[in-house]
Amino acid sequence: MAGSRLETVGSVFSRTRDLMRAGVLKEKPLWYDIYKAFPPLREPVFRRPRLRYGKAKADIQDIFYQEDQIRAKFFATYGSGQKAFDLFNPNFKSTCQRFVEKYTELQNLGETDEEKLFVETGKALLAEGIILRRVREARTVSVRLQASSEGHEPQEDDDLAQRGQVKQEPETAPSPP
C-alpha cells in the first residue's frame, strides 16, 4: 500500500503548522508568514466530489461569433465548394473566408438587412470572378445529368417541361458499333 492519505485531512497550512509544532520541519516555508498574515476567505480543504448519475450538464456557455453565423449560413446555402484548401500556401483564403470578409466590408458600408446583405455579397463575389453554386441547384443538376444518362428524365423536369420552363432536348438513340 502506498502509505497514508493525510492529504485529504486538513489544509496544507494546517498540516505544515502541525509538522512545525512537532519539530519535523525545522524551518518555516517562505509562504508560511504571508499565508498567516493574509489567510484566504475560504480555507482550501479537500472535499470528495459528489457522484453524478446520468449525463452531467455542462455549465460552459457556447461561444458564437458573428462571423461563425455567417459561415454557417454560407455552408448551408453554398456547401463546402469544389475547391480544396491549399495548405501549402500561407496566403490562401477559402471561398468562405472571402465571403465573410466581403460580407463584413459591405456591412460596414451601412447595409443592415441580413438577407439582402447575404445576396449582395454573393453578387459582389460574382463580380470578382468567384462563382458560388447553391447546394440545391447543384443537386438538381446532378440528378438531371444522372437521369439523362440512364435514359429517362426525373419527375421534376417533366413538371417543369409541362409548364414550359425547361426546353427538352430530343433523345438520340446510341448508334450501333
Swiss-Prot record:
TM helices/strands, residue ranges: none
Location of N6-acetyllysine modifications: 102
GO MF assignments: structural constituent of ribosome
Presence of the UniProt keyword Mitochondrion in the record: yes
Modified residues (N6-succinyllysine): 83
Record's keyword terms, sorted: Acetylation, Mitochondrion, Ribonucleoprotein, Ribosomal protein
GO CC terms in record: mitochondrial inner membrane; mitochondrial small ribosomal subunit; mitochondrion; nuclear membrane
Chain positions with N-acetylalanine modification: 2
Family: Belongs to the mitochondrion-specific ribosomal protein mS23 family.
Oligomer and partners: Component of the mitochondrial ribosome small subunit (28S) which comprises a 12S rRNA and about 30 distinct proteins.
Protein name as catalogued: Small ribosomal subunit protein mS23
Species annotation: Mus musculus (Mouse)
Organism taxonomic ancestry: Eukaryota, Metazoa, Chordata, Craniata, Vertebrata
